[in-house]
Amino acid sequence: MDDFKYDYSPMEYLINEKVTGRKCERNREILKLRFLRGLTFEEIAEIMQMSDKQIGRIIHRYGDPLLIMLAKSR
């Protein structure tokens, strides 16, 4: 077994590497709150001061492809 320790979880690595664009920092933070901390859309919307509809749109745009990449990497 390899004793190598990752600095990031696999999902956090994907979020940091694959989420790019004009508002990437905000989108990365939203995805980390959802996938790494397990918060609901409503909780994230309150923290980020956005509507839960906007949060859902971002999570579905980026999150679904990230989950697929994570599943393929295992």
Which residue ranges define each predicted feature?
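Residues in the helix-turn-helix
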Residues: P10, Q54
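Hydrophobic positions on the alpha-helical face of helix-turn-helix-like DNA-binding modules
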Residues: L31, I44-A45, I55
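A short, glycine-centered helix-capping/turn motif at helix boundaries
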Residues: R37-E43
